[in-house]
């Protein structure tokens, strides 16, 4: 049932697994579901993968909503590419399930589902979604997205939502003499834990406390 799906997603909040699969029932000939299909008022595909389209508990619309949530779960959680952003986004939603479902509807409404997106573009869409919610303090979400980008790689292209790096580039260069081999990013917020319960490593330093090394 839909409520059960939501509860399973809440269990994820406690366990914080690195991967979570949101599966769908199939009606295979000879299986328990096949024998009880009429009792459950199950309507399912006549061809592989024989997925259930609706039951007496779940409408076709419910199934479609779950599929949207599943796709966003794969993109934003199971990919492990947006851990801090997702952790933060959860705090302004009733549950993780509602978060992924609503995000899926946002993708659908804007025609993003059928497109191929880069990781930075996925972050941009996530921020567009947050902006659509009317969040007062967007800066913390901008910086969370920046953290997710630079904690994985020294991105060649600066994300358009990120702060202008030029304001502290000369100062931080003293700590990164080899430039392209290192990156120091400055944040106004402390991100203590990501969506997987892992502690966030100190990739950031405070610009106001930087001191040039003496030779």
Give the role of each language-model region.
Residues 5-8, 12-98:
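A structural motif corresponding to the C-terminal lobe/cap of the Radical SAM core domain
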Residues 71-210:
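Radical SAM enzyme core and accessory elements
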Residues 1-7, 11, 209-215:
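Single conserved hydrophobic/aromatic residue that forms the stacking wall/gate
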Residues 48, 205, 215:
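Extended interaction regions within the primary functional domain
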């Amino acid at each position: 049932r839909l409520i059960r799906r939501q509860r399973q997603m809440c269990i994820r909040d406690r366990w914080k697994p690195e991967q979570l699969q949101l599966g769908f029932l199939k009606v295979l000939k000879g299986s328990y579901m096949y024998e009880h299909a009429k009792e459950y008022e199950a309507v399912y595909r006549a061809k592989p993968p024989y997925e259930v389209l609706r039951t007496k508990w779940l409408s076709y619309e419910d199934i479609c909503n779950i599929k949207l949530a599943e796709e966003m779960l794969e993109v934003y959680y199971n990919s492990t590419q947006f851990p801090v952003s997702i952790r933060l986004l959860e705090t302004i939603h009733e549950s993780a399930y509602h978060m992924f479902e609503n995000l899926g509807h946002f993708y659908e409404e804007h025609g993003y589902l059928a497109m191929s997106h880069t990781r930075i573009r996925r972050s941009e869409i996530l921020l567009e979604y947050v902006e659509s919610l009317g969040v007062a303090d967007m800066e913390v979400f901008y910086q969370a997205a920046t953290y997710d980008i630079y904690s994985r790689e020294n991105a060649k292209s600066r994300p358009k939502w990120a702060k202008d790096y030029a304001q502290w580039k000369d100062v931080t260069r003293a700590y990164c003499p080899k430039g392209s081999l290192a990156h120091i990013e400055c944040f106004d917020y402390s991100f203590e834990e990501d969506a997987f319960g892992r502690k966030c490593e100190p990739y950031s330093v405070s610009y106001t406390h930087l001191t040039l090394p003496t030779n």
